[in-house]
UniProtKB/Swiss-Prot annotation:
UniProt enzyme class: transferase
Primary localisation category: nucleus
Pfam family, one: NOL9_C
Record protein name field: Polynucleotide 5'-hydroxyl-kinase nol-9
GO BP of this protein: cleavage in ITS2 between 5.8S rRNA and LSU-rRNA of tricistronic rRNA transcript (SSU-rRNA, 5.8S rRNA, LSU-rRNA); rRNA processing
Enzyme Commission no: 2.7.1.-
Organism annotation: Caenorhabditis elegans
Gene Ontology terms for molecular function: ATP binding; polynucleotide 5'-hydroxyl-kinase activity
Amino acid sequence: MEEVVRFECRDSNLEIYVVQPGERLSIFGSCSFLCLAGNASINDYNLPAVSCESSNFMKISAPQRMDVPAILQVFKSGPSYKHARLKFRLKEVAPKNYEKIMEMIGTTEPSVFIFSKILDFAEETVSGVVSNFLIHSSIQKQIILPPHFFISRDDFIIYPQQQEAQLKSQMNRLNKLRNDGQRTTILPIGHKGAGKSNLMRSLVNRCLSNGYEHVYVLDCDIGQSEFTPCGCLSLTKVTSPILGKPHGHQRASFENSFFYGDITVRDINLYMDIFERLFNKFKVISEPGSVCIINSMGWVTDEGAEILDGITRVTDPELFVEIFRDQTEARYQFLNRAEHNIVEIFANNSIGVIGLPPQKRLPAALIRELTIVGYFSSRLPRPSLASFPKVAPYKLRFENVTICVPVDLLVEDSHVFSSINTQIMALCINNTDLKPRKLYGKDDLPSICVIDGNSPALQCIGFGIIRGVSVEERIIFVVTPVDLLKLEEPPVLVRGMRIQTPTMFYTADPYNRCPYVLNDLEQGNSDNTLDGLYQPSVNTTQFKRSRRF
């Protein structure tokens, strides 16, 4: 890369890159970076020129196994370029090279970046469970360790130029509405695999770059959630650009989130009820001039189209952005198409890194599992799932706990603890409309509640994994990033459909230690009512586990 020059810094984990205007770079892998000088953007977010301080670094996450790179573009700078300020900043980070760099720059106005090789905790944890996740192994051999990212000059453009211009024009129109204090809504739409999630992130970054101070994401993609593990609808205020994948920016606890309890919509009425609650919440808590970007599902036909029709009626978006990659895929049929502002984008497909064999894209189920790993990574003592058994769990006393189970997963009272042991559970706020009963009718045992079509929507504050159950101590052990000590009352434990603890939690430990506590009743317990109430799960091999009841 003759136009991209690299220099070493005083800190061996940092590198300086000098990139000339007009360059367009693709970045695969993960790293942190900042812009010392120049006019540049990353994934449609305009980068500020800042000093080299730890708080100014922004994380990029563009795993090669997830196909689409981060796009770094450099433009002409204009009169705001400060050579003297750049020299001062370079002297701080590269005292041995700053004069050489400034001599090379001369009177030109390139963008100057500092890249950090250090992975953040969540990224390192996730990259350890999927081979060739960040970058291909053949690239790793070409890079001085640690090989976490790779910069190429592939001129990859996601959105064609004409459609890019249309999108910019529409964003400028919305910006005028913002200046008038009007709240606006943007609805990106796309079939499965079209790149809708990347489009949603791009729209967030564009809004932040266009002067929006109040950007909200209403995430209703229960199968591929952005800020929570799957199964939730949520409203999140975004204050910084989204430059990574969901596993890297999970929130520990949620302020405005409801647990739908599945990765696909089986009850449209409940789904739309939750959606309307969250959109009404946006209208109540958002500031004048705010924008709400809706992360819809990649489902545009049949029931998916019915849901999009409902979302359109509730929100009346000021802008629709439809993205598609495959002309043979069915597309959404808009209601009253002529009345809407619609930008259609036929997106380009990423070809990966030139010269390397194409890698199979990760399946949706694995992406969901990686999001769960990223969510719990903040509780790990080190960035490896093998350290999960060392995480100290919270203790919840039986009499204070309510367990909610979908009707399809209901078991006999004697098997309740076995059915939730090791499972991931949504932590929800108690709702007076729930109709719980005590296990065996005993006050010192948990309450059990069946979730069916008549159950209320439950507000979700986070997720936890049942670490174990002690019938003797009357305690359930839960591992969660949520600070349960700050709650006024214990959360309701809610199990979802098709939302399970990832298998990698069981196989990551080379010593094959079970990731849960094993407690059993003492033989000859005087209370025969509890006999057989709990039998521990048994880890039979590193790759298979079975349950004994």
